[in-house]
């Protein structure tokens, strides 16, 4: 168990938290939610001891081990992947290294023998003999192949490092597990594996995530952070949403009845307070009036952008033909003879762990990269808007947001363009910010503004939910569902994929693909996925036997 007692954190004159009291108990998974800037990640740092609060204290049950997801992707570059995971249990890792150092000695003394015996006993008590196989199981589950387990962390790409650090946090069955955005940079298969892991995890979990489906799957409780306070709700994210909405409605209805009662009492008092025969009744009603207190209903600090993609032209029947596209990058065949035809009502989700293949295809279709072989042809009625995963070059500019966005608008009017920015929560002077100073979430909202203002009938999204808060993801999800054109997209948010896509294309590790007309959940239950799981399980069993 871990509890926060009277936690206050002040940043200058502003109090991010004020006298927060909350207890997280064993056997529960708590989803910590709140608007961007509410302090979710900061609160996890306080719980983990990485940050000292202004006042108050954190209490952990004596003897319990706390583990948290490291955010520094370069911290373990000098270590192997396997060692990095095992370091999730520092005491166990230290024992392993001390044992190895003793056994490497050429002048092995009696004292060394006694110390080695003590370490071996503690090592056995901690199930140390299974440490490497346990670490390998976590890595395989998250999609890190066995051949990479002895690789130096410095040699891994960023997305793989995130998976290793997540495996480190999960390693060794910690008593308290703190996870800050664990699904970031995970493909949908890895997220599904993590969901099952957390569902079966018997200790305390506190997780920050913007993935609604993930929170619904794993959470037993929701910790809602708003106005510097934390309110606990039993149930998952959807239950919290319904409960919080119901509570507000009930308070509004109660206030309405109170206001009607106040009006009735005030009318009686004003009519009869000067009447001698009614003076006692008027006095009684004054006392009753003084006792009535309206509930203080504060509007949530959460803000929802308005996302509405409206094509300027209706799309025809011929949309896109992809014929035999292949592409090799750095000696690796990323796309291998890819062919498919897109219909006028297709919303295609590209899934699977091969993120480079998806990004490469989108770049080719957007005209930013040439294929090595094959061709593609857009229909004459189509117009495309592309949301790139890497937007670094776009925002490396001192241009003002409103000026940059105006170039994509048919109507060259600043007021008109500011209207789109306003829908995306850029209020007042935000529109004259320079491009290079924007935060990750602001950059995404600017790119979505561009897609809305262009009025294209084909939208290409490469991981659009990265850096967005839950409110923005919900708005984007609704906009994608309502869009009457064609969408080609890759997204880590299960709910976005499930509610938007009517066709699934999965790129396999060898560069080939599977194409199936279905929702995402239907695809996961399909024969194709069953065969994939069978191959994976067989491989895992063979590795375990080795």
Language-model region placement:
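Conserved catalytic-core segments of large NTP-driven translation/proteostasis enzymes
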Residues: 305
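Intracellular alpha-helical coupling/juxtamembrane segments of multi-pass membrane proteins
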Residues: 243-296
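Proline-centered turn/helix-capping motifs that create local helix->coil transitions or kinks
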Residues: 130, 277-281, 291-301, 377, ...
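ABC ATP-binding cassette signature C-motif
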Residues: 1-255, 308-546
């Amino acid at each position: 168990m871990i509890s926060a007692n009277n936690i206050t954190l002040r940043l200058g004159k502003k109090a991010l938290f004020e006298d927060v009291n909350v207890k997280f108990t064993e056997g529960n998974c708590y989803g910590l939610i709140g608007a961007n800037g509410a302090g979710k990640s900061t609160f996890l740092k306080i719980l983990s001891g990485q940050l000292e609060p202004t006042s108050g204290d954190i209490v952990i049950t004596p003897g319990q081990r706390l583990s948290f997801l490291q955010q520094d992707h370069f911290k373990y570059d000098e270590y192997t992947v396997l060692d990095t995971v095992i370091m999730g249990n520092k005491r166990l890792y230290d024992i392993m290294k001390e044992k190895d150092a003793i056994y490497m000695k050429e002048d092995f003394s009696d004292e060394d023998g006694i110390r080695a015996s003590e370490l071996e006993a503690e090592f056995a008590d901690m199930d140390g003999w299974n440490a490497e196989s346990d670490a390998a199981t976590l890595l395989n589950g998250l999609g890190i192949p066995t051949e990479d387990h002895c690789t130096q962390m410095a040699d891994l790409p960023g997305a793989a490092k995130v998976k290793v650090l997540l495996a480190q946090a999960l390693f060794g069955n910690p008593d308290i597990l703190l996870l800050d955005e664990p699904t970031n940079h995970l493909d949908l298969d890895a997220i599904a594996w993590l969901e099952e892991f957390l569902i079966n995890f018997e200790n305390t979990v506190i997780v920050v995530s913007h993935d609604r489906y993930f929170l619904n799957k794993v959470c037993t409780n929701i910790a809602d952070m708003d106005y510097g306070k934390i309110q606990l709700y039993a149930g998952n994210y959807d239950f919290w949403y319904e409960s919080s909405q119901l509570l507000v409605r009930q308070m509004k209805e109660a206030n309405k009845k109170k206001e009607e009662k106040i009006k009735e009492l005030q009318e009686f008092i004003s009519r009869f307070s000067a009447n001698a025969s009614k003076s006692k009744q008027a006095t009684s009603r004054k006392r009753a009036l003084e006792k009535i207190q309206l509930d203080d209903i504060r509007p949530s600090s959460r803000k929802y952008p308005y996302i509405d993609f409206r094509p300027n032209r209706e799309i025809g029947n011929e949309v896109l033909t992809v014929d035999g596209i292949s592409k090799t990058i750095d000696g690796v065949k990323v796309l291998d003879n890819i062919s498919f035809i897109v219909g006028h009502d297709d919303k295609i989700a590209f899934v699977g762990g091969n993120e480079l293949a998806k990004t490469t295809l989108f770049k080719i279709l957007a005209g930013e990269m040439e294929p090595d072989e094959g061709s593609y042809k857009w229909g004459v009625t189509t117009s495309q808007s592309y949301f790139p995963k890497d937007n670094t070059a776009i925002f490396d500019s001192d241009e003002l947001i409103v000026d940059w966005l105006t170039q994509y608008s048919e109507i060259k009017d600043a007021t008109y363009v500011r209207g789109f920015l306003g829908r995306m929560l850029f209020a007042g002077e935000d529109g004259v910010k320079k491009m290079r100073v924007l935060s990750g979430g602001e950059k995404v909202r600017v790119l979505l503004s561009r897609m809305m203002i262009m009025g294209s009938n084909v939208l290409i999204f490469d991981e659009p939910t990265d850096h967005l808060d839950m409110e923005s993801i919900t708005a984007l999800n609704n906009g994608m569902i309502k869009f009457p054109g064609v969408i080609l997209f890759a997204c880590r948010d299960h709910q976005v994929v499930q509610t938007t896509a009517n066709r699934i294309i999965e790129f396999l590790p060898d560069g080939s693909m599977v194409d199936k007309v279905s929702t995402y959940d239907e695809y996961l239950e399909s024969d194709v996925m069953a065969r994939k799981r069978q191959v994976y399980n067989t491989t895992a069993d063979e590795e375990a036997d080795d």
